Amino acid sequence: MRSFRASIFGLTGLILVPLLACQPLSAYAQAAPTEPTPVQLMMNALANANAAVVGIRVSAADGARSAETLGQRRNGSGVLIGEDGLVLTIGYLLLEAEQIEIVTQDNKTVPARAVAYDLATGFGLLRPLLPLPKEIAEHIVALGDTRELKPGEALMAVTGPQPNNDGDIAMTRLVSKRAFSGTWEYHIESALFTSPPITVSGGNHSGAPLFNQKGELIGIGSLLVADASGADKKQPGNMFVPVDLLRPILAEMQQSGMSQKSRRPWLGVTSSDQGGRVQVLRVSKGGPAQLAGLRAGDVVMAVDGVPVATLETFYKKVWDRASPDAEITLTVRQGDEVKSIVLKAEDRMLTLKKPASI
């Protein structure tokens, strides 16, 4: 079991020292002996947050498409957000899951089931099939608010345990808040980027919770990135999905297994921004793009006649349809030729193998 105090006191330069420097001595002189100091309150809040973190182990179903990129077996982290055992994690861990286990901080496992996967935000929800141990169940974290976060603010990220791996606690700083477009047909407007990067041992950074100094949950770990600052100078770090995106859809996710925004056209392409153009890196086997004749190396120039030069404009134009299975015309450069390729998009959520619980 990881030692919270040993970890936190070794990292006081990020949070505790600045906090102490901001407190006048009179604040401590006037406090009653039994009244907790601001530092003690912060330590208690972060200790509660740390205790709510769990590990997650997933085995994907046989024949799962997602196994090609995510693997058949996946490890990650999650955090308890509900009295009924509801755990929040990053959704790609749960894609086409056949078996899910929660790993407690004393390295015991509890079987779990997927509750939701939200394609639009990337969040995933799960619940244990058996009661969680009391030392975890009594520690539930509140959702914070990232609107007031400022670059440079000290934060705490925690990775969940795995067998033979106790997880880790890392102090990090917010580097930037900005829009993020993923290569896998994904875009959010307000991703959180932190540095230095948190521990990557065993892949536990996937789903790792990010906490503010009040012990409130503000983000869920998605990726390791080489450019956390977004500037020319490379600064390795992590991208977290902000919980601000969860709050308005949490009830819908629990009821329907996803938000309505997840029902959108999917092409089955992995693409990247390449100096003012959108280049296809790969196409999913059997997906709409492959069936229509798109190939790796193609450059997407327009969607339905509207020029696109970034992943963001590409995705938003594709998603601007009333039906997820709409016909879409792509203008692409394929080698030395410019072609118009018509494809029939799919509802990504209908292509995934799902356990009976969703």
Where are these regions (language model features)?
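N-terminal activation segment of mature serine protease catalytic domains
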Residues: 27-92, 99, 150-157, 251-252, ...
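A short glycine-leucine-enriched loop at secondary-structure breakpoints
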Residues: 145-148, 204, 209, 288-299, ...
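C-terminal cap/linker of serine protease catalytic domains
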Residues: 33-46, 134, 157, 161-162, ...
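Active-site region of chymotrypsin-like
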Residues: 52, 60, 71, 129-142, ...
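Terminal peptide-recognition signature
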Residues: 51-56, 78, 85, 89, ...
